[in-house]
Amino acid sequence: MSCRVCLEDRSIKPLPCCKKPVCDECLKRYLSSQVQLGQAEIQCPITECNKHLDESTILYSLPHDDIIKYKYFLELSRMDSSTKPCPQCKHFTTFKRKTHIPNPTKSENKLKIQCPSCQFIWCFRCHAPWHEGVNCREYKKGDKLLRHWANEIEHGQRNAQKCPRCKVHIQRTEGCDHMTCSQCNTNFCYRCGERYRQLRFFGDHTSNLSIFGCKYRYLPERPHVRRLVRGSVCAGKLLIAPLLIVLGLVLGALAVVIGLFGLPIYCLCKKQRKRTRTGMPW
Protein backbone atom coordinates (compact mmCIF):
# COMPACT_ATOMS: atom_id res chain seq x y z
CA MET A 1 0.00 0.00 0.00
CA SER A 2 1.39 3.45 -0.96
CA CYS A 3 1.56 6.28 1.57
CA ARG A 4 -0.50 9.28 0.43
CA VAL A 5 2.22 11.67 1.66
CA CYS A 6 5.60 10.19 0.64
CA LEU A 7 4.13 7.80 -2.01
CA GLU A 8 6.36 4.94 -0.84
CA ASP A 9 5.07 1.37 -0.68
CA ARG A 10 4.93 0.22 2.94
CA SER A 11 2.87 -1.80 5.35
CA ILE A 12 0.42 0.91 6.45
CA LYS A 13 -2.60 1.04 8.72
CA PRO A 14 -5.23 3.40 7.19
CA LEU A 15 -6.29 6.49 9.13
CA PRO A 16 -9.53 5.94 11.10
CA CYS A 17 -11.19 9.15 9.84
CA CYS A 18 -10.92 8.71 6.07
CA LYS A 19 -9.33 5.25 5.65
CA LYS A 20 -6.49 6.78 3.60
CA PRO A 21 -3.00 5.26 3.99
CA VAL A 22 -0.35 7.40 5.70
CA CYS A 23 2.86 5.79 6.96
CA ASP A 24 3.97 6.12 10.60
CA GLU A 25 7.00 8.26 9.77
CA CYS A 26 5.02 10.84 7.79
CA LEU A 27 2.26 10.93 10.41
CA LYS A 28 4.78 11.50 13.22
CA ARG A 29 6.43 14.38 11.36
CA TYR A 30 3.07 15.97 10.59
CA LEU A 31 1.75 15.66 14.16
CA SER A 32 5.00 16.97 15.64
CA SER A 33 4.88 20.06 13.39
CA GLN A 34 1.27 20.76 14.42
CA VAL A 35 2.12 20.46 18.12
CA GLN A 36 5.02 22.89 17.65
CA LEU A 37 2.44 25.38 16.31
CA GLY A 38 0.33 24.94 19.45
CA GLN A 39 -2.51 23.04 17.80
CA ALA A 40 -4.74 20.89 20.00
CA GLU A 41 -7.37 20.05 17.40
CA ILE A 42 -5.28 18.56 14.59
CA GLN A 43 -6.83 18.03 11.19
CA CYS A 44 -6.23 14.94 9.07
CA PRO A 45 -3.12 15.33 6.84
CA ILE A 46 -5.19 14.27 3.82
CA THR A 47 -6.36 17.52 2.20
CA GLU A 48 -9.70 16.19 0.99
CA CYS A 49 -10.59 15.01 4.51
CA ASN A 50 -11.93 17.80 6.73
CA LYS A 51 -12.13 15.74 9.93
CA HIS A 52 -9.92 16.01 13.01
CA LEU A 53 -7.72 13.15 14.16
CA ASP A 54 -8.92 11.53 17.38
CA GLU A 55 -6.89 11.89 20.56
CA SER A 56 -5.91 8.21 20.73
CA THR A 57 -4.43 8.28 17.22
CA ILE A 58 -2.45 11.43 18.02
CA LEU A 59 -1.08 10.13 21.33
CA TYR A 60 -0.16 6.79 19.77
CA SER A 61 1.71 8.39 16.87
CA LEU A 62 3.34 11.39 18.58
CA PRO A 63 7.01 11.26 19.59
CA HIS A 64 7.43 11.00 23.35
CA ASP A 65 8.84 14.55 23.71
CA ASP A 66 5.75 16.08 22.09
CA ILE A 67 3.13 14.21 24.13
CA ILE A 68 3.50 16.53 27.16
CA LYS A 69 3.16 19.62 24.94
CA TYR A 70 0.11 18.18 23.19
CA LYS A 71 -1.61 17.38 26.50
CA TYR A 72 -0.93 20.94 27.68
CA PHE A 73 -2.45 22.50 24.54
CA LEU A 74 -5.36 20.06 24.73
CA GLU A 75 -6.11 21.02 28.33
CA LEU A 76 -5.75 24.69 27.44
CA SER A 77 -8.31 24.39 24.63
CA ARG A 78 -10.81 22.54 26.84
CA MET A 79 -10.65 24.72 29.91
CA ASP A 80 -13.54 27.02 30.80
CA SER A 81 -13.34 30.67 31.81
CA SER A 82 -12.69 29.73 35.46
CA THR A 83 -9.35 28.08 34.67
CA LYS A 84 -6.25 29.74 33.23
CA PRO A 85 -2.52 28.91 33.03
CA CYS A 86 0.00 30.86 35.05
CA PRO A 87 1.74 33.41 32.76
CA GLN A 88 5.12 32.30 34.10
CA CYS A 89 5.14 28.51 34.60
CA LYS A 90 1.92 27.48 32.73
CA HIS A 91 0.51 25.75 35.82
CA PHE A 92 -3.29 25.69 35.52
CA THR A 93 -5.17 27.58 38.20
CA THR A 94 -8.92 27.46 38.82
CA PHE A 95 -10.48 30.62 40.21
CA LYS A 96 -11.33 29.60 43.76
CA ARG A 97 -11.04 31.29 47.14
CA LYS A 98 -8.16 29.11 48.20
CA THR A 99 -5.98 30.47 45.37
CA HIS A 100 -6.50 34.11 46.40
CA ILE A 101 -4.03 36.19 48.30
CA PRO A 102 -5.45 36.29 51.88
CA ASN A 103 -7.06 39.40 53.37
CA PRO A 104 -8.01 41.33 50.21
CA THR A 105 -8.44 45.04 50.86
CA LYS A 106 -10.40 45.92 47.71
CA SER A 107 -12.83 44.17 45.39
CA GLU A 108 -10.14 44.11 42.70
CA ASN A 109 -7.93 42.04 44.99
CA LYS A 110 -10.35 39.15 44.61
CA LEU A 111 -8.74 38.62 41.21
CA LYS A 112 -5.26 38.47 42.71
CA ILE A 113 -3.87 34.97 42.18
CA GLN A 114 -0.73 33.42 43.56
CA CYS A 115 0.45 30.43 41.56
CA PRO A 116 0.84 27.42 43.87
CA SER A 117 3.64 26.08 41.69
CA CYS A 118 6.01 29.04 41.19
CA GLN A 119 4.45 31.60 43.61
CA PHE A 120 4.09 34.13 40.77
CA ILE A 121 1.37 36.71 41.57
CA TRP A 122 -0.89 37.65 38.67
CA CYS A 123 -4.32 39.02 37.75
CA PHE A 124 -6.87 36.40 36.79
CA ARG A 125 -9.03 38.79 34.74
CA CYS A 126 -6.41 40.19 32.33
CA HIS A 127 -3.85 37.37 32.67
CA ALA A 128 -1.02 39.79 33.47
CA PRO A 129 1.36 40.28 36.41
CA TRP A 130 -0.51 41.73 39.37
CA HIS A 131 -1.05 45.51 39.08
CA GLU A 132 -1.43 46.87 42.61
CA GLY A 133 -3.76 49.88 42.92
CA VAL A 134 -4.68 49.93 39.21
CA ASN A 135 -7.75 48.26 37.71
CA CYS A 136 -7.48 46.12 34.57
CA ARG A 137 -8.90 48.77 32.23
CA GLU A 138 -6.45 51.43 33.39
CA TYR A 139 -3.64 48.93 33.34
CA LYS A 140 -4.36 47.93 29.73
CA LYS A 141 -4.32 51.58 28.68
CA GLY A 142 -0.94 52.24 30.21
CA ASP A 143 0.46 48.78 30.91
CA LYS A 144 4.05 49.91 31.30
CA LEU A 145 4.83 47.20 33.82
CA LEU A 146 3.43 44.44 31.60
CA ARG A 147 5.13 45.76 28.48
CA HIS A 148 8.39 46.12 30.37
CA TRP A 149 8.12 42.53 31.62
CA ALA A 150 7.06 41.18 28.19
CA ASN A 151 9.85 43.01 26.35
CA GLU A 152 12.59 41.92 28.71
CA ILE A 153 15.00 39.51 27.03
CA GLU A 154 15.68 36.26 28.85
CA HIS A 155 17.45 33.24 27.36
CA GLY A 156 17.79 35.03 24.04
CA GLN A 157 14.10 35.89 23.58
CA ARG A 158 11.45 38.25 24.97
CA ASN A 159 9.36 37.09 27.92
CA ALA A 160 6.02 37.23 26.12
CA GLN A 161 4.25 38.47 23.01
CA LYS A 162 0.73 39.86 22.79
CA CYS A 163 -1.77 38.20 20.46
CA PRO A 164 -2.70 40.86 17.84
CA ARG A 165 -6.36 39.86 17.99
CA CYS A 166 -7.42 39.06 21.57
CA LYS A 167 -4.44 40.84 23.24
CA VAL A 168 -3.62 37.90 25.54
CA HIS A 169 0.09 37.66 26.32
CA ILE A 170 1.66 34.39 25.19
CA GLN A 171 4.99 33.07 26.39
CA ARG A 172 7.04 30.80 24.14
CA THR A 173 9.15 28.13 25.76
CA GLU A 174 10.66 26.77 22.53
CA GLY A 175 9.98 26.30 18.83
CA CYS A 176 9.81 28.62 15.82
CA ASP A 177 8.44 32.17 15.56
CA HIS A 178 5.11 30.99 14.11
CA MET A 179 2.66 31.09 17.03
CA THR A 180 -1.02 30.13 17.24
CA CYS A 181 -3.07 31.78 19.99
CA SER A 182 -4.86 29.12 22.03
CA GLN A 183 -7.68 31.56 22.83
CA CYS A 184 -8.68 32.81 19.34
CA ASN A 185 -6.55 30.61 17.00
CA THR A 186 -4.86 33.64 15.43
CA ASN A 187 -1.54 32.89 13.69
CA PHE A 188 1.11 35.50 14.40
CA CYS A 189 4.86 36.06 14.53
CA TYR A 190 6.47 35.90 17.97
CA ARG A 191 9.32 38.23 16.97
CA CYS A 192 7.31 41.20 15.66
CA GLY A 193 3.80 40.42 16.99
CA GLU A 194 2.12 40.83 13.57
CA ARG A 195 -0.43 38.44 12.08
CA TYR A 196 0.63 35.92 9.48
CA ARG A 197 -0.76 37.13 6.16
CA GLN A 198 -0.12 35.92 2.66
CA LEU A 199 -1.36 36.66 -0.82
CA ARG A 200 -0.39 34.72 -3.90
CA PHE A 201 2.14 36.59 -6.04
CA PHE A 202 2.78 39.09 -3.20
CA GLY A 203 4.44 36.70 -0.71
CA ASP A 204 3.87 36.02 2.99
CA HIS A 205 5.33 36.80 6.41
CA THR A 206 8.52 34.82 5.70
CA SER A 207 9.30 36.72 2.47
CA ASN A 208 12.07 39.31 2.74
CA LEU A 209 10.69 41.67 0.08
CA SER A 210 6.97 41.16 0.68
CA ILE A 211 4.82 43.90 2.23
CA PHE A 212 3.54 41.13 4.54
CA GLY A 213 7.08 40.15 5.60
CA CYS A 214 8.41 40.29 9.15
CA LYS A 215 10.29 43.51 9.88
CA TYR A 216 13.15 41.53 11.43
CA ARG A 217 13.77 39.56 8.23
CA TYR A 218 14.90 42.52 6.12
CA LEU A 219 16.79 45.65 7.25
CA PRO A 220 15.41 45.70 10.82
CA GLU A 221 17.60 48.70 11.71
CA ARG A 222 16.51 50.74 8.66
CA PRO A 223 12.68 50.78 8.68
CA HIS A 224 12.31 53.64 6.17
CA VAL A 225 14.50 51.90 3.60
CA ARG A 226 12.69 48.61 4.26
CA ARG A 227 9.28 50.19 3.64
CA LEU A 228 10.55 51.92 0.50
CA VAL A 229 12.02 48.73 -0.97
CA ARG A 230 9.02 46.57 -0.13
CA GLY A 231 6.59 49.21 -1.36
CA SER A 232 8.50 49.51 -4.63
CA VAL A 233 8.47 45.76 -5.13
CA CYS A 234 4.72 45.64 -4.43
CA ALA A 235 4.06 48.55 -6.81
CA GLY A 236 6.12 46.84 -9.49
CA LYS A 237 4.11 43.66 -9.11
CA LEU A 238 0.86 45.62 -9.29
CA LEU A 239 2.04 47.16 -12.58
CA ILE A 240 3.34 43.91 -14.02
CA ALA A 241 0.30 41.80 -13.09
CA PRO A 242 -2.12 43.45 -15.61
CA LEU A 243 0.53 43.23 -18.34
CA LEU A 244 0.99 39.52 -17.67
CA ILE A 245 -2.77 38.99 -17.76
CA VAL A 246 -3.07 40.84 -21.09
CA LEU A 247 -0.09 38.95 -22.50
CA GLY A 248 -1.65 35.66 -21.42
CA LEU A 249 -4.95 36.56 -23.08
CA VAL A 250 -3.17 37.58 -26.31
CA LEU A 251 -1.14 34.38 -26.40
CA GLY A 252 -4.26 32.35 -25.67
CA ALA A 253 -6.19 34.06 -28.48
CA LEU A 254 -3.25 33.58 -30.83
CA ALA A 255 -3.10 29.88 -29.97
CA VAL A 256 -6.83 29.54 -30.72
CA VAL A 257 -6.44 31.29 -34.09
CA ILE A 258 -3.47 29.12 -35.01
CA GLY A 259 -5.44 26.04 -34.00
CA LEU A 260 -8.49 27.02 -36.05
CA PHE A 261 -6.60 27.86 -39.23
CA GLY A 262 -3.29 26.09 -38.89
CA LEU A 263 -4.59 22.63 -38.03
CA PRO A 264 -6.76 22.21 -41.19
CA ILE A 265 -3.90 23.48 -43.37
CA TYR A 266 -1.49 21.08 -41.69
CA CYS A 267 -3.87 18.14 -42.21
CA LEU A 268 -4.37 19.12 -45.86
CA CYS A 269 -0.63 19.36 -46.48
CA LYS A 270 -0.06 16.02 -44.80
CA LYS A 271 -2.74 14.41 -46.95
CA GLN A 272 -1.24 15.98 -50.10
CA ARG A 273 2.21 14.69 -49.17
CA LYS A 274 0.83 11.19 -48.68
CA ARG A 275 -0.94 11.24 -52.06
CA THR A 276 2.23 12.48 -53.76
CA ARG A 277 4.25 9.60 -52.31
CA THR A 278 1.73 6.96 -53.40
CA GLY A 279 1.27 8.54 -56.84
CA MET A 280 -2.47 8.80 -56.41
CA PRO A 281 -4.29 11.57 -58.36
CA TRP A 282 -6.39 14.15 -56.62
From Swiss-Prot:
Active site positions, chain numbering: C176
Entry's Gene Ontology BP terms: protein ubiquitination; ubiquitin-dependent protein catabolic process
One GO MF term: ubiquitin conjugating enzyme binding
Binding residue positions for Zn(2+) 1: C3, C6, C23, C26
Keywords, ordered alphabetically: Cytoplasm, Membrane, Metal-binding, Repeat, Transferase, Transmembrane, Transmembrane helix, Ubl conjugation pathway, Zinc, Zinc-finger
List of residues binding Zn(2+) 3: C163, C166, C181, C184
Pfam families attached to this UniProt entry: IBR, IBR_1
One GO cellular component term noted in the UniProt record for this chain: ubiquitin ligase complex
Region TRIAD supradomain: start-end pairs: 1-218
Enzyme Commission identifier(s): 2.3.2.31
Protein name: E3 ubiquitin-protein ligase RNF217
Species per Swiss-Prot/TrEMBL record: Xenopus laevis
Gene designation: rnf217
